[in-house]
């Protein structure tokens, strides 16, 4: 399974990248609660919200164990010690991926920067 960041889900919902449609239909993909929350901030109409919920419900739902939250804080502190400040949701997604030993798929450059400091973070390499 690959854990998705909201950047990928949002790009998929916009429907402008045919490659994403193919990848979403062929890969086992999951989202965690924080990604659901981020994605659901973007709806404008009830129909938009229903479409987003349907897309999110079609993905594997990955829960965040209580034990991960302390590690999120530790990882944020480690990143800051190296001069990198990232949004808390990105640190949650990265830490959850590391905890589950699965790849994270993001289009946000924060993740590559985090990986240089947190080498156990595995990032999905999007095909060209």
Segments (PLM) and residue ranges:
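Phosphate- and divalent-cation-binding pockets in alpha/beta enzyme and binding domains
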Residues: 38-39, 71, 113-114
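Histidine- and aromatic-rich ligand-binding microenvironments
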Residues: 4-7, 32, 85-87, 108, ...
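Acidic, PIN/NYN-like endoribonuclease modules and their adjacent C-terminal/linker elements
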Residues: 1, 16, 94, 98-128
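Active-site neighborhoods of divalent-metal-dependent phosphate/nucleic-acid chemistry enzymes
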Residues: 12, 60-107
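Conserved beta-strand segments of alpha/beta enzyme cores
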Residues: 28, 60, 120-122
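Short, well-structured N-terminal submotif of metal-dependent ribonuclease cores
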Residues: 1-35, 40-54
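Short, hinge-like loop/turn segments at secondary-structure boundaries
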Residues: 46-50, 79-80, 121-125
């Amino acid at each position: 399974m690959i854990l998705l960041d909201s950047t990928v889900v949002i790009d998929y919902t916009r429907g402008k990248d045919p490659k994403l449609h193919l990848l979403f239909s062929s890969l086992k993909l999951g989202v965690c609660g924080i990604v659901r929350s981020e994605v659901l901030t973007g709806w404008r109409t009830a129909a938009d919200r229903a479409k987003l919920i349907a897309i999110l419900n079609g993905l594997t739902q990955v829960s965040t164990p209580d034990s991960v939250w302390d590690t999120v804080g530790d990882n944020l502190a480690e990143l800051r010690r190296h001069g990198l400040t990232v949004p808390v949701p990105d640190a949650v997604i990265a830490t959850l991926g590391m905890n589950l030993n699965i790849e994270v798929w993001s289009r946000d450059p924060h993740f590559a920067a985090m990986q240089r400091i947190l080498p156990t973070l595995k990032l999905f390499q999007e095909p060209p």
